Amino acid sequence: MRKTVLAVALAVVVVLVAASMTYYVSRNSPLGSDNSECSDPGSISSHVYNPYRLTIIKSCIRASGVVENVFDEADGDYHVRLALDSQYSNLTNSANDQYQFGDLVVEVICALPITQADAVSACQNYTNNITIPSVNDRVIVTGPYVLDTQHSNWAEIHPVYTLTIS
């Protein structure tokens, strides 16, 4: 009887470990990239204004493409529209098609003077060191892949962890 209980307990532990590993990999493996390229340097995510509005799909992904447009936002972010390279075309959705000309939204946070009063506290004690791209720059970005629930659930990388102009 004691051996049976031990065997059952061991089996339960093995199943729980396997399930935990599967969950961890599914939540943390970026699309099109390995985890070595994707991390949150300096806890950038802790400086996102009203993070509750973002539904995290993947904790970190990599994507590349050409910058279509760059907008200043009142919350201090740069809103970058990225025309994705074909291998990343699955990252956009119908809301991106309808409101963002089919582009992925890429948000570089706390990079501008903040003119929206309730956003000021999010950027306190954080200095953004990410280079801001120009229109027509080819870039590679990493960061959380999210849906913005306050903007029709369009897809974004928000915040950008790294941005390389290539």
List each language-model region with its residue ranges.
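OB-fold and OB-like single-stranded nucleic-acid-recognition modules
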Residues: 2-9, 16-166
